[in-house]
Amino acid sequence: MKAVIQRAKQASVTVNGEVVGAIDAGLVVLLGVTHEDTEADAAYLAEKIAHLRIFEDENGKMNRSLLEVGGAVLSVSQFTLYGDCRKGRRPNFMAAAKPDRALPLYEAFNTFLRGKGIHVETGVFGAMMDVSLTNDGPVTLIIDSGDKPGNE
């Protein structure tokens, strides 16, 4: 499971001209699911993202977590994170999980975040979405559950 996280001053997601999710300060999380992912991967990423110290403290140092600053998450499913561009000119998305597998894991990820007391807004799974945000920093990180300790 891959997550691209962006620190944002505000963000929203629109489907068919209607805003379906919006946050003030917090994180935009673009989440991709692959075939081997499990709920343990969703739990790992939720834990990591909730506690990652990427918000500035009073000294301007990245020393505070999403939980500590009371930030929200705008969570957007994005199968294209598993696009393979090594051959040809068109990405291959065979590594992305099919919707019937990806949707429950995407929902589990959001549930794990909510279980930590984080306000989570979402896009619409599988829809064409317009995501708008004001990057804060900018701070953009990529986290892959396959890189967690114990995975060799």
UniProtKB/Swiss-Prot annotation:
> Motif Gly-cisPro motif, important for rejection of L-amino acids in this chain: where?
137-138
Alphabetical list of InterPro entries matching this protein: Daa-tRNA_deacyls_DTD, DTD-like_sf
Q: Which UniProt keywords apply?
A: Cytoplasm, Hydrolase, RNA-binding, tRNA-binding
The first-level EC class reads hydrolase
Enzymatic reactions: glycyl-tRNA(Ala) + H2O = tRNA(Ala) + glycine + H(+); a D-aminoacyl-tRNA + H2O = a tRNA + a D-alpha-amino acid + H(+)
For this entry, list what GO says about its biological process: D-amino acid catabolic process
Documented EC number(s): 3.1.1.96
Give the GO molecular function terms. Answer: D-tyrosyl-tRNA(Tyr) deacylase activity; Gly-tRNA(Ala) deacylase activity; Ser(Gly)-tRNA(Ala) hydrolase activity; tRNA binding
Q: Where in the cell is it found?
A: Cytoplasm
Q: Does the keyword Transcription regulation apply?
A: no
Domain of life of the source:
Bacteria
Q: Which GO CC terms are listed, alphabetically?
A: cytoplasm
**What does the annotation say about its assembly with partners?**
Homodimer.
What UniProt notes about the protein's domains is: A Gly-cisPro motif from one monomer fits into the active site of the other monomer to allow specific chiral rejection of L-amino acids.
Mind telling me which NCBIfam families this protein's record contains? D-aminoacyl-tRNA deacylase (TIGR00256)
Q: Which family does the entry's similarity section mention?
A: Belongs to the DTD family.
What this chain does, per the record? An aminoacyl-tRNA editing enzyme that deacylates mischarged D-aminoacyl-tRNAs. Also deacylates mischarged glycyl-tRNA(Ala), protecting cells against glycine mischarging by AlaRS. Acts via tRNA-based rather than protein-based catalysis; rejects L-amino acids rather than detecting D-amino acids in the active site. By recycling D-aminoacyl-tRNA to D-amino acids and free tRNA molecules, this enzyme counteracts the toxicity associated with the formation of D-aminoacyl-tRNA entities in vivo and helps enforce protein L-homochirality.
What is the protein named? D-aminoacyl-tRNA deacylase
Provide the species name: Geobacillus thermodenitrificans (strain NG80-2)
